[in-house]
Amino acid sequence: MMKKINKIALAVGGSGGHIVPALATREAFCREGVDVLLLGKGLENHPSLGEQQILYKEIPSGLPTFVRPITAVRRVCSLYAGYKKAKKELLIFDPDVVIGFGSYHSLPVLMAALKKKIPIFLHEQNVVPGKVNKLFSRFAKGVGVSFPPVIKRFACPAQEIALPKRAFSSFNPIVERLTSHSPTICVVGGSLGAKTLNDHVPPALVEVAKDYPHMYVHHVAGPKGDVVSIQHVYSRGGVSFCVKSFEQDMLSVLLSSDLVISRAGATIMDELLWAQSPSILIPYPGAYRHQEENAKFFVYTIGGGSMILEKQLSKAVLTKNILLALDPETIKNRREALRAYYQNKSSKSFYQFICECL
């Protein structure tokens, strides 16, 4: 018999690749009647929140890496302050379980949970484990993963789970516009890695439009993207487009796209699989190159698209890859490969996995 869970605290912060899965998990747990508290840093203004009303407490954090001594001292002090505040919030909320979603922002909360002997679970979104998740797996009850290759990298039981998806609209005027064009291309660079795609992709798509004059581009430029400049490139090239900083209804856009040009962060990877969207992946080169490993899995194991390393990016390389990706037979084969993989993915929820492990 599975144990009933009444309260869960989620330790989260950092990029959208950590925050979006945590918010989707929160929604899934709330549907199970669980009270959920988010503990972390930088969530209050994150665009993924939309109009959601969440129970959230800001927790200071710091990454004690090899930097200048004064910076290291400040970070350690911030980490300790976060640890103390996390202990206080956990004492007040009294959760049955704490779940860490990776990034150093989860560190003080996981430390506090360990000190208070609250069961810890982790969620790993990538093909390669993050440092905090790998460290705390030796203390955790279990790890829910998005991709099977990472299971063997942890010191506790790990299992593939079905990552909850962002809510999406069954009717969206954006989708109506997308489906009236052919082909439709979505460009999305993520919350932190969009600049390179914003600089390189629009000129290549202007070139591609010479072969596809009815092409439509939906470009998500990210919170720091220069929307006006990108619009100018498409407009000057005669390309039909929509450019925006953030797309609240990303799944609807992916479902309606013939090709997605994207980074290879964990959240977009999982959503590309769900939407069965053939893709060109341009992995962000930082953060121990985990996006490159994500992209390799998507391209070589699943067969869902192609990969271009950032150091290989040029207008000519992008144009060639986009034209190849828009070939109808290529789209058909890649979509079938994605469908075959997704049909065999685990359907077990994180909630079920946690209840079974307790």
From Swiss-Prot:
- What is its pathway? Cell wall biogenesis; peptidoglycan biosynthesis
Keyword list, A-Z: Cell cycle, Cell division, Cell inner membrane, Cell membrane, Cell shape, Cell wall biogenesis/degradation, Glycosyltransferase, Membrane, Peptidoglycan synthesis, Transferase
The record's subcellular location field reads:
Cell inner membrane
Membrane topology note? Peripheral membrane protein
Provide a GO CC annotation, any one. plasma membrane
Q: Name one Pfam family in it.
A: Glyco_tran_28_C
Among PANTHER family, the record links this protein to: GLYCOSYLTRANSFERASE (PTHR21015:SF22), UDP-N-ACETYLGLUCOSAMINE--N-ACETYLMURAMYL-(PENTAPEPTIDE) PYROPHOSPHORYL-UNDECAPRENOL N-ACETYLGLUCOSAMINE TRANSFERASE 1 (PTHR21015)
Q: This protein is called what?
A: UDP-N-acetylglucosamine--N-acetylmuramyl-(pentapeptide) pyrophosphoryl-undecaprenol N-acetylglucosamine transferase
**To which species is this protein native?**
Chlamydia abortus (strain DSM 27085 / S26/3)
